[in-house]
Amino acid sequence: MIVRAIALLLCGASALPAAAQDRAAADPSATQDIVVIGRGLPTRPGDRTADVVAIDAARIRESASGRLETVLADVAGLQQFRRSDSRSANPTSQGLSLRGIGGNASSRALLILDGVPQADPFGGWVPFPAYATDRIGLIRVTRGGGSGYFGPGALAGTIEIDSADPADQPTLAADLAYGSRRSLSAAASGLLRRDGGFATLSAAYDRGDGFVPTVAESRGPADRAAPFEQFSAAARSVVALGGQTELQTNLSGFTDTRDRGTAFTRNRSQGADASVRLIGRGDWGWSALAYLQTRAFASQFASVDAARTTATQTLDQYNTPATGTGGRIEVKPPLGEGRDLRLGADVRRVSGQTQELYTYVNALPTRRRVAGGTALTYGLFTDASLTAGPATLTLGGRVDRWRLTDGALREAVIATGAPLTNAIFPERRGTEWTGRAGIAVTPVAPVTLRASAYRGWRLPTLNELYRPFRVGADAVAANAALEPERLSGIDGGVTLAPGAGISFAATVFWNRLDGAIANVTAGRGPGTFAGVGFVAANGIYRVRRNLDAICSTGLELDARWQSGPVFTQASWSHVDPRVVASGAAAALDGLRPAQTPRDLTSATLGWRKGGAAISTTLRHAARQFEDDQNSRSLAPATTLDGYAALPLTRTLGVELRAENVFDARVETGISGNAIVERATPRTVWVGLTLRTG
């Protein structure tokens, strides 16, 4: 169905630019001033007051892994909950956050693609295999900033992704690469240009036999390699409707199958997205967006004996359907030079439920669980900027209403249908006020000083509210009484740009996340615990709870330099997040949140000229704790990646990519009886590229 829908959209996308060309032929004056760019409204002048890092298309193409999560690692402080990427991680662990603001795997940073929020409607994680990097033209990462303009979820920051610019795309592109462990990566795209519009169609496929996630000293006969297979496709059309209005349509879909390295640990994700956006570029700028997202997720879980000789199935999360719908309207009135005002409203509704089989006896499930609900947020926002001489002032705010409905947790005996749990959770609702104020001043030409203060908020995901889960022998109970997270923060920084090819930025910040949701240790196995059932002797029982707060202070440095074909860039984030806790979580007071390293560093040195390129990227992650009690730590890790591209003819080229060149051990997790998992070992790729038109 996804492929059929993409084909239909491509036909429509092709017809729209053709129709625009026909109109132009009939009336040449109708299109002489039309410039179709496929982007949203212009960026706000007030962004000068924020800590913003941009990643351009050239840098995106040079990722050694070819994956979005690796590209984002160029921005120090932006991290997933775990260090593993989307070839071996459980998808539910792939939430994004910044500045050590976390506590669990849900995203605290808002990822937006062409204006559409991308977090999974049920669980808040990011489906990274859905985003082939050749479809991306620009990434803008805003550290901090609150929820004012972008909406709920933009607590620790925002990642804005724009689709590839047709001016930078060939008519036909194809890439084919073969890598370590029988890995295959293939991608192809086509571009149709017409006066007044364009259309693109692209597809990507990745597979591999995978590596053994469990480190050598922890392995047993039950451990095996973790293969993966992933596919995505997207169709996009942009057409001018008159001289000042653009119609942008997008349709995409993906499938993602992974394994976690033992029997009964396969997981599968599927999704499809559709969106329509109208952009008005006249004196009154405006934007109107509507979107639909559907997701399906399934995952198996296993228990491995102490000798790691046998894996036994413990849970089958056989289906987790989820849907997200929403829209956004924004207006930019003409106020004259130096003034910018945005007024708008947005809405997002998500619904979903997990369907699971558990409590296996003689290899057969004896119980069934269904849990889920619906969440709705809608809000009004305003954002104003004033530029007067060397100073830019910005002030914005929003008010949101939220509502949780249809929350339920039902468990029953499969053989008889007898209910074990029939919890119907009451409807909840509330109002959140957030905003941002900032100033940027350029006292002398190369120097810009900036400061900002902001508030943001995030509604708990349906996954956090209603679904218990397991990781190895450990189990975590849901909590339908969770409150929204609320963040307050201040930033101060300086940007130096003494020349066109050089820049340096430094930012200090203080953030406080009130009501931070974390997985709080509440017991140890063996034993039977509320919300999860039996936990084995090596297992830990945790409950999702609102902590009093997480306070994080830190420093961020970013530098770039380019001279002719040679360039370098570096990014360093140093954070000190600390838990503020009392009551049942008092033992966590003063500790660091799980999976939050003090230091993250990335540095790249490269050369580009005439289609040829070579670069190396060094990354370092400091020691971080596996658990909320800071009793288990993951060792620091330093990796080196390499990339080289050489044109053979005008259309053909060769690529060589190497991930983790020195095969460093990158620890990603510790579970059960000190079983350590690792991220991707050394992986080498050799590929061919085709570019025409």
Predicted regions and their residues:
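Conserved C-terminal beta-signal and adjacent last beta-strands/turns
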Residues: I6, A440, A451, P484-I490, ...
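N-terminal periplasmic accessory domains that precede
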Residues: L68-V71, Q94-G100, I112-D114, V126-A132, ...
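Extracytoplasmic beta-strand/coil segments of soluble accessory domains associated
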Residues: E69, A73-V116
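Short acidic/polar hinge/loop motifs at secondary-structure boundaries
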Residues: V116-R143
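Periplasmic-side early beta-strands and strand-to-turn transitions of outer-membrane beta-barrels
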Residues: S147-G148, E160, A167-Q169, D175-A177, ...
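Outer-membrane beta-barrel signature, preferentially recognizing the C-terminal barrel domain
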Residues: F264-G282, D316-T325, G372-A375, T421-T442, ...
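Surface-exposed extracellular loop regions of Gram-negative outer-membrane beta-barrel proteins
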Residues: T294-A298, S351-Y360, R401-L420, E427, ...
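Gram-negative outer-membrane beta-barrel transporters
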Residues: T387, L393, S503-A505, F509-L513, ...
